[in-house]
Every structure is written in C-alpha cells, then in structure tokens.
C-alpha cells in the first residue's frame, strides 16, 4: 500500500552492514555479499544486498525472521557493525538500495552510526517506531550479541558455530568432517539453545515495531 506522497505504508527492514576496522585490512564486502546471497536465497529479499559506498553494504527485507538470521550470523562473524531501520520506504523501490529513500533508510543510517560509536555496548542498533519497542529489540539483540560472543570465545565460532540446529546432526557432521557428538557439543558451547529460544521473540518484536504491539492496535481500532 502506498500513501499520497508515494511512501509505502507497509513495514520494511533496511539493514546497513559496515566492515569494522577496515583500515589496512582486506575488503570483505565481496565475501559478505556472497554469504548473504547464499543464506537468504531470495527469502524475504525486497532489494538485494549490494555495496553502497566503501566497505558498506545494504539491503531491504520484509521478513523479520530473515532479518534475525542475518543479524545473528554476522554477529557471530564479529567483523561488522549493523544498523537496522524499520519503517516505510519511498516507492517504487529501485533495483539497488543506494538509490532508494524513505524513513526506514534514514533510520538505518542513524542505527549503523550508533552501532559504530565508541559508546555502543554491542555492534548492532535498531531504529523504529514506537521508540520503546525499538529499544526493547535493541536490548534483546545486545544480549544475543553478548551470548554469541561468549560462545565464539569458547570455541563455538567458525563453521561449526554457524551450523543451524534445524538441520540433522549427521548431515552437519558430514559437511564439517567431524562426529555428531562434536557437532552437538559445538552447538551447546555456542549457546544454541539460548539463541534458538530468543530468535522468535526478537522476530516477533521486529514485526510489531511498525504497527505497535497487538494491544495497542486493538486500542486504535476501538
């Protein structure tokens, strides 16, 4: 749906990803673009991720669960600052995000700058309305980021640390060239149970960011 000014009334998720400490280090943008393309395979993608400027990439999604998956995967990597803007966009959307505009894009820029700041407690920030809901999402994301960091520090990072609990342990073990027991231990070390429990909660909160929680929507209709 589009309003009279040409802005979408549907919520969109604009994710800006900036390489951390890129000065003097190899450009990892091609790597992360290939990684995101493989991970999402078009799922929830409205505008594909692409380089915007320098070592920064940006994409537009409409699926909160896909957003959570991308954010957590990049947090495990540890080499990126992430800014998520939630809100309307100006339509029609172009083929590349650097040519797009709208509230969600402004919020994504503000969020990634916040995530890059020295005062940031986690390399991820969220901007959306209502502000209180965005703050709750950011807080939960921060706790997830801390958990992911602890898991990686204990040996849960790398390819094994990114393995998904939804796949068969035998298949994952075969792909990694290790035993099923090693996969199970690796996932436990990487705090997989805690992450699996938190993922749907964060996705739900993201889905409510633009519209507000169910109770608020019922009050508006009354």
Region spans (language model):
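Regulatory and interdomain segments flanking nucleotide-handling catalytic cores
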Residues: 1-222
């Amino acid at each position: 749906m589009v309003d009279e000014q040409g802005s979408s009334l549907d919520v969109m998720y604009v994710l800006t990803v900036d390489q951390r400490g890129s000065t003097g280090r190899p450009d990892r943008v091609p790597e992360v673009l290939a990684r995101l393309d493989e991970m999402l395979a078009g799922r929830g993608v409205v505008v594909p991720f692409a380089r915007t400027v320098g070592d920064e990439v940006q994409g537009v999604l409409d699926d909160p669960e896909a957003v959570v998956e991308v954010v957590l995967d990049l947090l495990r990597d540890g080499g990126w600052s992430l800014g998520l803007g939630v809100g309307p966009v100006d339509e029609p959307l172009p083929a590349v995000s650097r040519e797009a505009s709208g509230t969600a894009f402004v919020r994504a820029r503000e969020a990634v700058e916040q995530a890059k700041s020295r005062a940031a407690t986690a390399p991820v920030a969220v901007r959306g309305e209502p502000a209180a809901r965005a703050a709750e999402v950011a807080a939960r994301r921060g706790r997830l980021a801390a958990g992911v960091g602890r898991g990686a520090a204990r040996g849960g990072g790398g390819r094994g640390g990114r393995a998904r609990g939804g796949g068969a342990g035998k298949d994952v073990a075969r792909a990694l060239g290790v035993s099923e027991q090693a996969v199970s231990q690796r996932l436990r070390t990487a705090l997989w149970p805690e992450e699996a429990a938190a993922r749907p909660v964060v996705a739900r909160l993201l889905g409510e960011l633009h519209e507000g929680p169910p109770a608020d929507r019922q009050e508006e209709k009354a």
